[in-house]
Amino acid sequence: MNGTEGNNFYIPMSNRTGLVRSPYEYTQYYLADPWQFKALAFYMFFLICFGLPINVLTLLVTAQHKKLRQPLNYILVNLAFAGTIMAFFGFTVTFYCSINGYMALGPTGCAIEGFFATLGGQVALWSLVVLAIERYIVVCKPMGSFKFSSNHAMAGIAFTWVMASSCAVPPLFGWSRYIPEGMQTSCGPDYYTLNPEFNNESYVLYMFSCHFCVPVTTIFFTYGSLVCTVKAAAAQQQESESTQKAEREVTRMVILMVLGFLVAWVPYASFAAWIFFNRGAAFSAQAMAIPAFFSKASALFNPIIYVLLNKQFRSCMLNTLFCGKSPLGDDESSSVSTSKTEVSSVSPA
């Protein structure tokens, strides 16, 4: 056995040397050098300083500008709210614990941090799924002439919270549990042990199949169909330069969206699956911490991809930041209307 299981924790190191100590009571500098904990704290501070303001600004700008409160934008606001939860309740705890070198808030604090980090991450993940489905419905029109309304948008948001809760809540009530992971300064579901008391095995199988495989399949299908539809429409209007430009923009955005999703979740899910199917195998605390870096970074690059690259949101943000006077003048506003025209022309009639 290459790990040590204790009361609500698992350390990826054998206790034959007698070095292993509870991550709730003692610094974990035997797992990694102190500077690595400080580097992790700096990384979390970076995400807090940049991720939290971008997500909060998205919420503020949407509240200030009525034209942003359109049904197709609701899910972007939900995505920003999820990022805010991750940054405020998750990143701040990891920052504090990394500075101290151990899970300084104890088992209860670990469970709370693990819950909010998982909830925010899952809301963000399912928001990307709903966003992909919404765009698929609007552009590909699988249901014919379908009017996307506020009720549909709110149903999509409710769906993200139901799915996220079905993943984040069970460990609080005995189906799996939240324990320190990586360098023992942040918490997540228990992938590491086969403790029958918590039915970890069934929970991990459920989480991997329902909360990773299903989203990946859905995103690849919907965005793949969207690109094919846009390319087919552009091929029928080859004489239109605006249509060709819109097709290229849509393709680039889809590639960015899919890559962003894969970068955020594939490393974490893959390593967690490897741990699950190789119980007792040797791995370092840093090896588990690195994939978590990518999933946490989604709170920063999701709003960049989905909000800051959205011309309408970007224009309103600049107006808000510069007190109603965008430094880009009228160009940005005009590009918004142009973008709308291009997208509608690419969409099949």
Curated annotation (Swiss-Prot):
Residues 62-73, 134-152, 231-252, 310-349 are cytoplasmic. It is a multi-pass membrane protein. The chain crosses the membrane at residues 37-61, 74-99, 114-133, 153-176, 203-230, 253-276, 285-309. Visual pigments are the light-absorbing molecules that mediate vision. They consist of an apoprotein, opsin, covalently linked to cis-retinal. This is Green-sensitive opsin-2. It is found in: Membrane. InterPro entries: GPCR_opsins, GPCR_Rhodpsn, GPCR_Rhodpsn_7TM, Opsin, Retinal_BS, Rhodopsin, Rhodopsin_N. Residues 334-349 have a biased composition (Low complexity). Phosphorylated on some or all of the serine and threonine residues present in the C-terminal region. Glycans are attached at N2, N15, N200.
